[in-house]
From Swiss-Prot:
InterPro entries: Asp/Glu/hydantoin_racemase, Asp/Glu_race, Asp/Glu_racemase_AS_2, Glu_race. The active site is at C74 (proton donor/acceptor), C189 (proton donor/acceptor). Pfam families: Asp_Glu_race (PF01177). It catalyses: L-glutamate = D-glutamate. Its EC number is 5.1.1.3. Provides the (R)-glutamate required for cell wall biosynthesis. It comes from the Bacteria. It comes from Bartonella tribocorum (strain CIP 105476 / IBS 506). This is Glutamate racemase. Substrate binds at D10, S11, Y42, G43, N75, T76, T190, H191. Belongs to the aspartate/glutamate racemases family. One of its GO terms (molecular function) is glutamate racemase activity. Pathway: Cell wall biogenesis; peptidoglycan biosynthesis. Keywords: Cell shape, Cell wall biogenesis/degradation, Isomerase, Peptidoglycan synthesis.
Length: 275
């Protein structure tokens, strides 16, 4: 079995929703979680600048850690530049997180779907390609929120969430027309599942919320070789750890990562140029 780590990457803590599902399926694997909190949020970055920024980070990470596989646990980056990453680093498998529009189209009964994402994901051509390919017969409402990812970060650090402000962010997802209404909402940002209880409380009516984390974890598992010791409980040889690009690491952040079983590695130089 390949003992190299699996590297997760996100702009913040949203990718932890996918990491926790991957751990269930492959507990013996070492995971490295990288949060580019210095660059958070990605939704409003200029595309070319963001691409260069991400490629610089991965040039450093892949040299330093030689992962068996990289998970881009960020919808904004996944819809923007998976092809760029695969082209620049052809020796490394990359798994992306893209809006689960196909699943939504398969599950909807009304034909009304909403995609709750960041502004960056909403405006990507790739998102529209997914809609045209898998949901051409559906009414698809794209909703780009500038605040929800930040709300998720605050919530996990124990801060109070303004329920009314959150409600305003999700209201456009609820569409009613010609006697039909939205019945499926895609969570197209890995941060958003952390807010699912708030979403259900503030929803105008009952809907199916699609979190693709489990499906992504299964895909990750399928790309890794099976352990030869099938009848033995898998043993993790190396501790999981997290890296943050920001040098302003708070006690609440460190406590949060510890709660997810991640040791915070400090004083790591990412050699990122200031934008």
């Amino acid at each position: 079995m390949d003992e190299r780590p699996v590297l997760f990457f996100d702009s913040g803590i949203g990718g932890l929703t996918v990491l926790r599902e991957a751990r269930v399926l492959i507990p013996e694997i070492q995971f490295i979680y990288v949060a580019d909190d210095a660059g958070f949020p990605y939704g409003n970055w200029e595309e070319n600048i963001l691409k260069e920024h991400i490629l610089n980070i991965f040039t450093n990470l892949l040299t330093r850690y030689n992962p068996a596989l990289c998970v881009i646990a960020c919808n904004t980056v996944s819809t923007l530049m998976m092809a760029d990453l695969r082209q620049k680093f052809p020796h490394v498998p990359f798994v992306g997180t893209v809006p689960a529009i196909k699943s939504a189209a398969e599950q909807t009964k009304s034909g009304f779907i909403s995609v709750l994402a960041t502004p960056g994901t909403v405006k990507r051509a790739y998102t529209n390609e997914l809609i045209n390919s898998f949901a051409g017969q559906c009414h698809v409402q794209l909703v780009g929120s500038e605040k929800l990812a930040g709300f998720a970060e605050d919530h996990l650090r124990g801060k109070t969430i303004d329920s009314e402000a959150l409600r305003k962010e999700i209201l456009p997802c609820f569409v009613k027309k010609n006697g039909k209404c939205t019945d499926v909402i895609v969570l197209a940002c890995t941060h958003y599942p952390f807010l699912i209880n708030f979403f259900r409380e503030q929803a105008l009516w009952s809907v199916e919320w699609i979190d693709p984390a489990k499906a992504i974890a299964k895909h990750i598992r399928s790309l890794l070789p099976l352990s030869e010791k099938i009848h033995q409980k898998p043993i993790k040889k190396y501790q999981d750890f997290a890296l943050l690009t920001s040098k302003n690491i708070t006690a609440s952040t460190e406590h949060l990562l510890k709660g997810f079983g991640l040791k915070l590695m400090k004083r790591v130089d990412f050699r990122i140029r200031d934008q």
